[in-house]
From Swiss-Prot:
This is dCTP deaminase. The active site is at residue 135. DCTP binds at residues 109-114, 154, 168, 178. Homotrimer. It comes from Helicobacter acinonychis (strain Sheeba). Keywords: Hydrolase, Nucleotide metabolism, Nucleotide-binding. Belongs to the dCTP deaminase family. NCBIfam families: dCTP_deam. The gene is dcd. GO terms for biological process: dUMP biosynthetic process; dUTP biosynthetic process; nucleobase-containing small molecule interconversion. It catalyses: dCTP + H2O + H(+) = dUTP + NH4(+). GO terms for molecular function: dCTP deaminase activity; nucleotide binding.
């Protein structure tokens, strides 16, 4: 299994639509950086957030109640205020179409981590297609800004030694083709 370089990421994105929209260079002046890097791609967070703000609720991943969260549009302000010790969901600006022989892993950016903002994203499985739902936690006792339309995490691509027998698409993955923020799902 090999870590893929910028030239491979660029080729797969421009010729096969792996990342769209695709930024061929790293943009980093006066913004939290995004775009192509040496061995990865820095993704951007969109302007829509879902804040988990019902203090009297129980979060149950097997029976999620959407009333436990509030949608917030941060496009006008350009940022979202994540309250102290709070959790929110968001989604990427980029749409992904993963190759069948490749898995991607996403790691939060150090700029946010150094401010106590932790970003979690599960792996992008072979042949997954869709926007990425991003989990964002504020681990501090202070409110924190998360900037819309700027970098939030870095994706690294690992190509398998052989093609998997069954991809995410083949299995009918429950988040296949997701658009916007996608809440937890359990197949029944």
């Amino acid at each position: 299994m090999g870590l893929k370089a910028d030239s491979w990421i660029k080729k797969m994105s421009l010729e096969h639509g792996m990342i769209s929209p695709f930024c061929e260079k790293q943009v980093g002046k006066n913004v939290i950086s995004y775009g192509l890097s040496s061995y990865g791609y820095d993704i951007r967070v969109g302007g829509e957030f879902m804040l988990f703000d019902n203090k009297n609720a129980l979060i149950d991943p097997k029976n999620f109640d959407p009333n436990n969260a509030t949608k917030i549009d941060a496009c006008k302000e350009g940022y979202f205020i994540l309250p102290a010790n709070a959790f929110a969901l968001a989604h990427t600006i980029e749409y992904f179409k993963m190759p069948k022989d490749t898995l991607a892993i996403c790691l939060g950016k150090s700029t946010y981590a150094r401010c106590g903002i932790i970003v979690n994203v599960t792996p992008f499985e072979p042949e997954f297609e869709g926007y990425i739902t991003i989990e964002i936690s504020n681990t501090t006792n202070l409110p924190a800004k998360v900037y819309a339309n700027e970098g939030i995490a870095q994706v690294v691509f690992l190509q398998g030694d052989e093609v998997c027998e069954q991809s995410y698409k083949d299995r009918g993955g429950k988040y296949q083709g997701q658009v916007g923020i996608t809440l937890p799902k359990i197949l029944k």
